[in-house]
């Protein structure tokens, strides 16, 4: 299964966290460094092997159409936008343009796939308009998946992860609210 992520910020952290979790379950290919553009994504796909059960691909964009191109290459089973911010604002003519560019990630998701959207983002409605899959989950405040009972310790974080399937306690080995 291919999981593709994009967003204005937090892509690399999210990719690394998800890749770390999936690597415990099965062999997983994870985008290295910032090989997340129209040159880096094909390079990463060349590393995909038969033993990989998962691929966590970070898709970045510095121009319109780049995520459409890379999403078409990876054909994700799960695709998600982390947020719509102001990175590369000039190249896209404003946050509306950034939203359109990031939403290209849903253009090539497999028909039975799952789309993930940020519930609390100012552009959540704009993002949702681009979703083509039946299965769509939102995360964050007001979403289908959200955290409660967040406790920050000096070297770790603990919280309850609420999902449509139930609630699980999560312990992260680092401090901070992410």
Regions found by a protein language model. Give the residues of each.
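Phosphate-binding loop of NTP-binding sites
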Residues: 1-115, 119, 125-132, 163
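Adenine nucleotide phosphate-binding catalytic loops in nucleotide-utilizing enzymes
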Residues: 95-96, 135-178
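Short gly/Ser/Thr-rich phosphate-binding loop of adenylate-forming enzymes
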Residues: 121-122, 152
